[in-house]
Amino acid sequence: KNIYSGIFRDLDEILLPMKIAEEHGRLPLKRGPKALQEIGIPYYHLTKKGLLIALSISEIKNREKLLKEFFSQSESSEKEFEKILSNLLESSPTFTYSIFKKYVKAFCDNKIKDLLPFDLAKLREISDESLIIQKEILSAFVKLSKQDKDDAIKFLDKIT
């Protein structure tokens, strides 16, 4: 019928059952249908799983904040990734978010059984060629001389 009914249908049929979002409370209404005036209109927040999915979506504007929120809810086994991902985010945000994108895509493609707990070692199982290439170039780059590094950067600037 309208966009609001579509949004609430998606919430009820997809986001809530998959625990991507959950109801955070209800706001009272002064106007509108009596039933909604009595029970209020619900508002929602992203769960930890929802935050992880949001980190994989490039159109999301405040992903730095979401990353901090995600790790504030992390288990001890997930903490090992927080420091390195936070450091990589400062110098290489596109690469960092591509890791989340690959992780969530692997889940959507049934290559990873569960999104949580967050474990980047699961990515090793999917054998992603672009990650292998990125690791290879980084390993090679750190071994180059200063001049060769400068030349490599100039070359990459020309092709990207």
Where is each model-derived feature located?
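Long, contiguous C-terminal modules that act as interaction/assembly or targeting platforms
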Residues: 1-2, 76
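Intrinsically disordered, low-complexity segments enriched in small/polar residues
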Residues: 2, 41-42, 153
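Short amphipathic alpha-helical interaction segments
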Residues: 2-25
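Functionally constrained cores in energy, signaling, and assembly domains
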Residues: 10-12, 21, 49, 56-64, ...
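Extended amphipathic secondary-structure runs
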Residues: 18-20, 44-46, 160
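Beta-hairpin "wing" of winged helix-turn-helix
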Residues: 19-37
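Short, amphipathic alpha-helical interaction segments positioned at domain boundaries
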Residues: 35-70
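Exposed, interaction-prone assembly regions rather than primary DNA-binding/catalytic cores
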Residues: 60-158
